[in-house]
Amino acid sequence: IALTIDSKFVRYCAVTIVSILENNDPKDIMLHIVSGHLPKEDVLTLSQVAEKYGTSIAFYYIPHEKLQNYEVKWQKQRLSMVVFYRCVLASILPSTISRVIYLDSDTLVLGSLKELWDTNLNQLALAGVQDTVSPNPSYFERLQYAPSYNYINGGVLLLNLAYWRKHNIEQQCIKYYQQYPDRIILNDQD
């Protein structure tokens, strides 16, 4: 399971981790925390939470330069770069990891993640759940795609990292972001 955070979200992430491990078998869970930088005390806090359940966390750090292609929108809205870390998971996580569940670090997991994990991606880049605002026609008009594609919640995803790597999805995200910045209002959600 991959979570992306900065120091402001450590306490929320700790709650997310507890909710994951309380509702799933900890021995089946490997946690991947991706951040720009975390102070040692934050790393220790999250590690101690995981250790209480007999699991561990791998920490990955993304250099600021890796995400410079996205910065125009961040600067306009003063958002943290963390919102785009999920777009680069395929190049950050080890190549031996072919799929990963991505969760926003303020997600409360109330049940098993097994059904999501077992989802057959059939050569798809990702699977997600329909967002509650999906019926809003303006989203589809702005993004210029058919409503039949649905609008998914970007905070709970099953990512096919092997597909992302093979088809250069990370670069496609960057290219789309650079070509159509005015279409992307909800940032990583779009």
For the regions a language model picked out, list residue spans one by one.
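Histidine-anchored nucleotide/phosphate-binding helix
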Residues: 10-24
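Short internal beta-strands
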Residues: 29-37, 128-129
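Catalytic core and acceptor-binding pocket of nucleotide-sugar-dependent glycosyltransferases
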Residues: 127-135, 149-190
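Short alpha-helix within the catalytic core of nucleotide-sugar-dependent glycosyltransferases
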Residues: 43-47, 95, 110-122, 170
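Active-site-proximal specificity loops/subdomain of glycosyltransferases
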Residues: 44-91
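Hydrophobic targeting segments
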Residues: 1-3, 20, 30-33
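Short aromatic/hydrophobic "clamp" motif used to bind/position activated sugar donors
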Residues: 100
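Conserved donor-nucleotide/metal-binding helix-loop-beta segment in metal-dependent transferases, i.e.
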Residues: 107-142
